From Swiss-Prot:
The chain crosses the membrane at residues 57-79, 94-116, 410-432, 457-479, 492-514, 551-573, 578-600. It is found in: Cell inner membrane. InterPro entries: Glucans_biosynth_gluTrFase_H, Glyco_trans_2-like, Glycosyltr_2/OpgH_subfam, Nucleotide-diphossugar_trans. Keywords: Cell inner membrane, Cell membrane, Glycosyltransferase, Membrane, Transferase, Transmembrane, Transmembrane helix. Pfam families: Glyco_trans_2_3. Belongs to the glycosyltransferase 2 family. OpgH subfamily. The gene is opgH. It is an enzyme of class 2 (transferase). PANTHER family: CELLULOSE SYNTHASE CATALYTIC SUBUNIT A [UDP-FORMING], GLUCANS BIOSYNTHESIS GLUCOSYLTRANSFERASE H. This is Glucans biosynthesis glucosyltransferase H. CDD domains: Glucan_BSP_MdoH. Gene3D superfamilies: Spore Coat Polysaccharide Biosynthesis Protein SpsA, Chain A (3.90.550.10).
Length: 721
């Protein structure tokens, strides 16, 4: 197959330069110990950043009230025979874990009633006089996915009357030279389709400092001043044009709005694991998300993508500092989104969650292993927030968001410690002879007893609170006859819900141990790195599964053996948490299987409305991706570039310009090594064999070096001839 760029003799990029002229602006790093001058700003509208206090009192107060009741009941369970040290430990761990689930419970109550009584959102249609830059950051992602999605969304948006108000930017941090060249080939194809219809641009950084946050900050400092808003997407995001327009209109109509976050629906799940996440997020997620939006109001949060941000607020208030010390707790802030939202709110702009907006989509990890890889990075970023939670001037709700993020991973060690403490308590009662008469004189013995009836009642209450978001979401769905019919009827919906609950219960203990391992490794100073995500196929060879789950199986066997030492009854009680660990290898393989996922899809089990009636924008993006896959079969590689002067010119036209360098400034090691290797090379062939992937990626991003390489003979044989 002939490369279309070579076949057409491409030497120029259709639609003009790869990036527009720069419009520089300041984005100062924020001081976490003091507020910048002029912050918090005064609201423009009356009540522009004020929220209803009674909503917080209801949700947080109710969570504290039921937590106090549960803790009192648990204390009553042990108080019958007096509290021992292990019982004190169980009580403390129970209190921490119960408070965590109680807040989600009270939030879901609010979400349930809001959704049950929701009316259609008011029409905010208005002409757009503001400019919005739509940003698609990418890092070693499959170019066919990214560029097909951008092309589809850009052309769909261009067909509306508001298309002129948006420009598109693919911001690449790709380090793999093959992927980088494939991105350029895809961008050339993209420009063929969008030139004259939509403004689409591409920039690849030579050095991905500060990862995604640094990528967007670089755009802001160089081009951000030309736009009123930034609509940030992710590499797997798709958004309907109407949703983008609504976000821009809401931002335009509210001068105090700093950030508006949508609640993305999960789509395109092909494996069983992806389908479980997709179903849960679609059926139960809106209950929690809507409840959260209802009570946090103007102190919402940012989840990193599928959100619109006021450029002025972001550039003036959300420049992230470099934390002192080494990773994992020092260095660049990894989970930047929570921090950026907190800083924007600190500066006096509102941060809201648009729970009423549909048409926002993303994808999810296809397997337990991919979840573990993603969560390892997120865990490090969230634990790093312990360095930020004390930042001066943060709203208490922003601090609560940071705490929630930390607890989403610390809760796993707390749950594990609670299980181990309870098991130890049972083993102590079974094997250790009780001290009926303590050192303190008493006429009556001290009997080690517990109120078992009270304990059982508390267990049922805890389970009810834990499963309440699922129950509320299912109830709302069951009362929606039209949606139930779409999903195959109420019986099929119930079957899907039962399947999701069972599979989630089996996977939960595995994820608990994965999170525990992540927390421990972070506390020991291990950095997560930055690996690209797998988004389609989640399968792994059985050998890899055995290796990755070896400790989970071992832990399950040891816990089961310890429970059996006490009694078969205790083992039976613990079996729901142990079965997933015992069978973690087959469970991981089955849930990552595309074939098994396809069977569930065929039977409409774990189906979602977006799967049955797929939005037009999603179908169009999928179809266009298939075409990109064909067009990119012959990847534009370094040898092809160097062999054709037209491709060299086109490649240089797509490069990010070299920053100005002051004489006497230090040369970076990578730059120095790459320059020396290029200068000493006798041919292109010998140089390409000598360069590492990182060095080749750097050379391909440096116009001076690539021109120097182009002057070399292709091989030593050519030189002698």
């Amino acid at each position: 197959m002939t490369n279309p760029m070579v076949e057409q003799g491409a030497s120029q990029l259709m639609g003009g330069s790869a990036m527009p002229p720069e419009q520089h602006g300041e984005m100062p790093e924020q001081n976490l110990k003091r507020l910048s001058e002029g912050f918090p700003r005064d609201a423009i509208q009356t009540g522009g950043v004020k929220s209803c206090s009674w909503r917080r009192v209801f949700v947080v107060g109710f969570a504290l009230l039921i937590s106090a009741f549960a803790i009192f009941e648990m204390r009553g369970v042990f108080l019958v025979g007096g509290l021992t040290p292990i019982e004190y430990a169980v009580l403390v761990l129970f209190a921490i874990n119960f408070c965590w689930i109680a807040l989600a419970f009270s939030s879901s109550i609010a979400g349930f009633f809001v959704l049950a009584s929701r009316k259609p959102a008011p029409n905010t249609e208005q002409p757009l006089t503001t400019r919005t830059a739509i940003l698609m950051p990418t890092y070693n992602e499959a170019p066919d996915r990214v560029f097909a999605a951008v092309e589809t969304m850009a052309l769909a948006l261009a067909k509306t009357e508001h298309g002129h108000a948006f420009d598109w930017f693919i911001l690449s941090d790709t380090t793999d030279p093959e992927v980088a060249l494939s991105e350029e080939q895809a961008f050339w194809l993209l420009r063929q389709q969008t030139a004259g219809k939509a403004n689409v641009y591409y920039r690849r950084r030579r050095k991905n400092i500060a990862r995604k946050a640094g990528n967007i900050a670089d755009f802001c400092r160089r081009w951000g001043s030309g736009y009123d808003h930034l609509l940030v997407l992710d590499a797997d995001s798709v958004m309907q044009p109407s949703t983008m327009i609504s976000l821009a209109q809401r931002m335009q109509s509210d001068p105090d709005a700093g950030l508006i976050q949508t609640i993305p629906a999960l789509i395109n799940g092909t494996t069983l694991m992806a389908r479980v996440q997709q179903f849960a997020a679609r059926i139960y997620g809106p209950v929690v998300g809507t409840g959260l939006a209802w009570w946090v109001q103007k102190e919402g949060n940012f989840w990193g993508h599928n959100a619109i941000i006021r450029t002025e607020a972001f550039m003036s208030a959300a420049g992230l500092p470099h934390l002192s010390g080494r990773p994992p707790f020092g260095g660049h802030i990894l989970s930047h989104d929570f921090v950026e939202a907190a800083l924007i709110r600190r500066a006096g702009w509102s941060v809201t969650i648009a729970a009423d907006l549909s048409g926002s989509f993303e994808e999810c990890p296809p397997s337990i292993i991919d979840l573990a890889v993603r969560d390892r990075r997120w865990c490090q970023g969230n634990l790093q927030h312990s360095r930020i939670i004390g930042t001066k001037g943060l709203h208490w709700i922003s601090r609560l968001h940071l705490t929630t993020g930390i607890m989403s991973y610390l809760s796993s060690p707390f749950w594990l410690l609670l299980i181990l403490s309870g098991l130890l308590l049972a083993l102590q009662a079974h094997f250790i002879r009780p001290e009926y008469f303590t050192e303190q004189f008493s006429l009556f013995p001290t009997w080690p007893v517990m109120d078992s009836a009270r304990a059982l009642q508390l267990f049922y209450i805890t389970m009810g609170i834990l499963f309440s978001p699922k129950i509320f979401g299912l109830l709302l769905l069951m009362f929606d006859g039209e949606m139930c019919r779409t999903l195959g009827g109420r019986l099929r919906v119930i079957l899907s819900a039962v399947t999701e609950i069972l599979l989630s219960a089996l996977v939960a203990p595995i994820m608990m141990l994965i999170h525990c391992g992540a927390v421990v490794s972070i506390l020991f100073g291990r950095d997560s790195g930055w690996a690209p995500q797998r988004r389609d196929d989640g399968s792994l060879p059985i050998k890899d599964l055995l290796y990755r789950h070896r400790w989970h199986m071992t832990a399950g066997v040891l816990l089961g053996y310890a429970a059996m030492l006490d009694s078969w009854t205790l083992l039976a009680w613990m079996s729901p948490a142990l079965i997933g660990l015992w069978f973690s290898v087959p469970l991981s393989g089955i849930t990552a299987s595309y074939t098994i996922g396809a069977w569930f899809k065929q039977k409409r089990i774990l189906a979602t409305p977006e799967e049955i009636e797929t939005p037009a924008i999603v179908l169009a993006a999928q179809a266009r991706r298939d075409e990109y896959v064909v067009d990119l079969q012959e990847v534009w590689n370094a040898r092809m570039v160097l062999a054709d002067h037209n491709l060299i010119a086109l490649h240089i036209a797509m490069m990010d310009k070299l920053p100005s360098r002051q004489p006497g400034t230090a040369i970076e090691p990578l730059d120095a090594v790459a320059r020396i290797k290029v200068q000493e090379a006798e041919s292109q062939e010998s140089l390409l064999a000598l360069l590492t992937k990182v060095e080749l990626s750097y050379v391909l991003g440096n116009p001076l070096l690539i021109q120097q390489v182009a002057k070399l003979p292709p091989s030593l044989a050519n030189q002698t001839v």
